Amino acid sequence: IACNTAHYFYDRLAAALPVPVLNMPRLTAADAKAAGCHKLGILATDGTLLAETYQIACRDIGLEWAAPGEQAQKGIMSIIYDEIKQGKRVDMQLFNAAVDDLHAQGCDMAVLGCTELSLVKRDEHLGPFFIDSTEVLCKHAMRACGVEPVGFED
């Protein structure tokens, strides 16, 4: 499932399908923890935050989490819907305001928990503070198919 928000339905989908289904939030939280993360910031849509898929994934493995404050979250929503989905360049001041908010809350890593936010990583060459949920899913899907992932930045 290549949509973070759709993981709200993961348990029902996984139970109904005859094939294994990878869980992007759980895999991302586990990879963040394996990379030494103690508190994961969640950059995602309001829907993903309300669905609590990342919060639950973090809680289940003993990883602390934080979401941006109200104003910073409005900025993330604007980036996703008013900029990326409209084919516009991302206002990095808005993005950095959300990142600063997560740093202030003690996060040592942040998940790009919306597929559109992967484009920010690509275009702005974001550093190791960020873990891209789309990349995590791709890597785990490749491994599930018996192929070792190559070509990803670490």
Feature roles, as predicted:
Residues 1-154:
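Non-catalytic structural scaffold of enzyme domains
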